[in-house]
Amino acid sequence: MTVAAGIGYALVALGPSLSLFVSVISRKPFLILTVLSSTLLWLVSLIILSGLWRPFLPLKANVWWPYALLVITSVCFQEGLRFLFWKVYKRLEDVLDSFADRISRPRLFLTDKLQIALAGGLGHGVAHAVFFCLSLLTPAFGPATFYVERCSKVPFFLISAIIALAFVTIHTFSMVIAFEGYAKGNKVDQIIVPVIHLTAGMLTLVNFASEGCVIGVPLLYLVASLTLVHCGKMVWQRLLESRNQSSASR
């Protein structure tokens, strides 16, 4: 393939994230810092997980259960880290609100909190794309492409970029769901995020079957779509509640 193809694969994986960054995140410095810190945090977590599993590699390609165990342990570790990330954010939010009270300035608005959660999720998604897609794209800039036997209809680099895009979407918007679930004590949202994460991870194992990507990738995008819809409904409801409370207090 050519340089254009390599850039195209990268844009498939991260193009929507770049658009979101330029249109929303780049306007506020604290959101940029949130994205950068979140990306670094999740990259470090993936490196730690890689180190923990290094003694057990290579895994046998014809046995699926070690990969399932890998997915389960990775999801559990990252979900625990997500909760710690929210705890740190909550402490910073309390500090900022206290400082705003001292200088007689308004506290963080609901939209600010939602955007911080969005930025944190975007950092998680970008870290996933960098680790699992962009790190593989160097050969894509060369004169040829690469196919794998179990997904012979689509180039390996393209399918990697498509899967990365799905995970970027899932991680970005599930972070918003999780932060609101933690803040409101909503057990449903607190549970649904790990379930979404685990389901998406398990669906990647379908690719081990012959032409499994034909089934696994659409199912992965179904999960991403449901995550996006649920997040949209939740945010809309929270904005309506906030507006009603503001109207009632006047």
Swiss-Prot record:
InterPro entries: Aph-1. It is a multi-pass membrane protein. It comes from the Eukaryota. It is found in: Membrane. The chain crosses the membrane at residues 5-25, 29-49, 57-77, 116-136, 157-177, 191-211, 212-232. Signal peptide: none annotated. GO terms for cellular component: membrane. The keyword Transmembrane applies. Probable subunit of the gamma-secretase complex, an endoprotease complex that catalyzes the intramembrane cleavage of integral proteins such as Notch receptors. Belongs to the APH-1 family. Probable component of the gamma-secretase complex, a complex composed of a presenilin homodimer, nicastrin, APH1 and PEN2. This is Gamma-secretase subunit APH1-like.
